[in-house]
Amino acid sequence: MAESLGIGMIGSGFMGLSYSQCVVAHVEGAHLVSITGGSRAGALAEEHGVPADESVEAMVARPEIDAVIVATPDQCRLEITEKVAAAGKHLLVEKPMATTVAEATRML
């Protein structure tokens, strides 16, 4: 059997909730590893039985995380995306990807 893809969730608002529920219920071959970001991260992590990381840095340091979903407010995504990419993790960034074309270009 192939290994399951470990997913980290950054963001605990409506879209963080939606994406995490989708990963848990509908993404075959993937599992939620941890959640960080936002005032509801702890509650959302508890709901899914995963840890709530204290920071993006703590999350991306986890070797069991292969990919990260970024579901944060638009203005936060550039810095987060750069940290996740620097850690060598795959990314799914919510739309709009960035607030400017220059930021989006940096993210690529």
For each predicted feature, which ranges?
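Beta-loop-alpha module in the N-terminal Rossmann-like domain of NAD(P)-dependent dehydrogenases
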Residues: 48-108
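N-terminal Rossmann-like dinucleotide-binding module
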Residues: 1-47
